UniProtKB/Swiss-Prot annotation:
Name of the protein in question: Small ribosomal subunit protein uS10
Subunit structure: Part of the 30S ribosomal subunit.
Phylogenetic placement of the source organism: Bacteria, Bacillati, Cyanobacteriota, Cyanophyceae, Oscillatoriophycideae
BP term (GO), one: translation
GO molecular function, one term: tRNA binding
Domain of life the protein comes from: Bacteria
InterPro entries: Ribosomal_uS10, Ribosomal_uS10_CS, Ribosomal_uS10_dom, Ribosomal_uS10_dom_sf
CC terms in the record's Gene Ontology section: ribonucleoprotein complex; ribosome
Record keywords, A-Z: Ribonucleoprotein, Ribosomal protein
Task performed by this protein: Involved in the binding of tRNA to the ribosomes.
Length: 105
């Protein structure tokens, strides 16, 4: 079993708004650095584009269509040598509602 000094915490973040995602990444990295852990990142991952094609008219006109898209921005942050203070500070961190967070130990 690995000790706390050899462990790594990997945090994956997803959001539709890039600015909201970047501010959340800054908060996590600042919190990790304040508790004497080593934070590497945020590492940007490829942005996923999802395009939806919708008919403009509710009736016959099939030639008239409209396209909508959603972009999902993703980041990874690795935290090396976390202490119990680091984990407690990350648990108490208040992040915006539009950011999905996945934590792996």
């Amino acid at each position: 079993m690995a000790t706390l000094a050899q462990q790594k915490i990997r945090i994956r973040l997803k959001a539709f708004d890039r600015r909201l995602l970047d501010t959340s990444c800054e908060k996590i990295v600042d919190t990790a650095n304040r508790t004497d852990a080593t934070a590497i990142g945020p590492i940007p991952l490829p942005t996923k584009r999802r395009i939806y094609c919708v008919l403009r008219s509710p009736h016959v006109d099939k030639d008239s269509r409209e396209h909508f898209e959603t972009r999902t921005h993703r980041r990874i942050i690795d935290i090396y040598q976390p202490s119990s203070k680091t984990i407690d500070a990350l648990m108490k961190l208040d992040l915006p509602a539009g950011v999905e967070i996945e934590v792996k130990l």
